[in-house]
């Protein structure tokens, strides 16, 4: 792992879940300071080959990033895909190219059944879908104007054939999910969560009662929205 490239980094100010002094998002506090790496999600440097110079760690995402040095001297970060190693070449184009891992082109030029990542939902806005570690989408149908992709969640999405996508699956690595101390959550900006049954009735629908008993209602949030399987997404 190499050190960051300062010209490709930004200082991102933390809001800590506050909006003008008032808590707008609960359970969020100050986190460890880190630089934001500018990732090339648009892949709009067309028909210029680039070589993978090094692999970097990015604290803002759970996938590794690759530093690409193009033949004209410009450097950009992209999300590392499987089988993309140092000294490999990548290219982005609107025309047909070899479907190697890390290359980027429009959906029109990609075969059905190919695994892709960093998929645009509208042309020229940058990759939106399948950007986290180990994620992938699959092209399952194409016609003259549109294509259908299957997202990691199983949802099928209809998009334009002019949307860009990167070939391959996002790289995976072992992520330690076990927390050895409470401070590890504070590093991530996560504050403690108080249970509703431990509150007073004025603070939560589950509050009050004698001992550990509370009102006999279904599990719900602070604002009375049902939880435990209740779907909130509108179709």
From Swiss-Prot:
RNA-binding keyword on record: yes
GO biological process, one term: translation
Region (Disordered): 197-218
GO CC annotation: large ribosomal subunit
Entries under PANTHER family matching the protein: LARGE RIBOSOMAL SUBUNIT PROTEIN UL2M, RIBOSOMAL PROTEIN L2
Assembly, per entry: Part of the 50S ribosomal subunit. Forms a bridge to the 30S subunit in the 70S ribosome.
Chain's role: One of the primary rRNA binding proteins. Required for association of the 30S and 50S subunits to form the 70S ribosome, for tRNA binding and peptide bond formation. It has been suggested to have peptidyltransferase activity; this is somewhat controversial. Makes several contacts with the 16S rRNA in the 70S ribosome.
Family: Belongs to the universal ribosomal protein uL2 family.
UniProt xrefs under SUPFAM superfamilies: Nucleic acid-binding proteins, Translation proteins SH3-like domain
GO molecular function, one term: structural constituent of ribosome
Keywords: Ribonucleoprotein, Ribosomal protein, RNA-binding, rRNA-binding
InterPro entries: NA-bd_OB-fold (IPR012340), Rib_uL2_dom2 (IPR014722), Ribosomal_uL2 (IPR002171), Ribosomal_uL2_bac/org-type (IPR005880), Ribosomal_uL2_C (IPR022669), Ribosomal_uL2_CS (IPR022671), Ribosomal_uL2_dom3 (IPR014726), Ribosomal_uL2_RNA-bd_dom (IPR022666)
Protein name (record): Large ribosomal subunit protein uL2
PROSITE patterns xrefs: RIBOSOMAL_L2
Listed Pfam families: Ribosomal_L2, Ribosomal_L2_C
